[in-house]
Amino acid sequence: LRDLPELLDAVCGYYKRRFHVEITPDQVASCAGSQEGVGHIGMVLCDEGDTVLLPTPCYPVFIAGSLLGGAKPWYYPLTKEHGFLPYVKDIPEDVARKAKYMIVSLPANPVGSVGSPELYAELVAFAKKYDILIIHDNAYSDIIFDGAVGNSFFNTPGAMDVGVEFFSLSKSFNVT
């Protein structure tokens, strides 16, 4: 089963216009929704007993997806002290070494925090250091307030080497 070339081209065009990110059709895959992709990626990436890094609070499908893959979630807290953003310095080195992937959801629902270029650069460096895949849930990039701007993880140098990004048509375009 292949995606329609017109759909892939439209996604590439949208990413260029909206996020100023150049991607090619071979870097795009459609799912029946970003929830499906995030919920099933653990079955592809994980073996029984692997560790995955999940935010808390988080969308329940993040947990279910990791468990479907046989992985053990390790929860990193999103605290007020750090602006409800991932703070990789609090992830113990022994945990980071075992992790297959880390899910990052920015802009974050329900807290509304938005990632900065500096944070994304830290995540890229963390992923490279520990050979971890960053799974960026970008479903809410167009639903933010107070003048904030949602962005793509792929705007960060090196992010395409260590990341997968999920974008949702249902949130931005009410397409389900």
Model regions: which residues?
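N-terminal small-domain helix-loop-helix segment of the aminotransferase-like
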Residues: L1-Q35, H40, D90
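A short helix->loop->beta-strand "cap" motif at the edges of active sites that frequently abuts
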Residues: D50, A71, F126-L133, M160-D161
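Active-site PLP attachment segment
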Residues: V149, T156-T176
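Active-site phosphate-binding strand-loop segment of PLP-dependent enzymes
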Residues: T79-G147, N151-F154
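Conserved coil-to-alpha-helix start sites within the AMP-binding
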Residues: S34-V38, C58-F62, F173
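Conserved PLP-anchoring active-site segment centered on the Schiff-base-forming lysine
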Residues: V44-S66
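Short acidic capping loops at alpha-helix termini that bridge into adjacent secondary structure
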Residues: E22-V28, E48-T51, K98, M160-G163
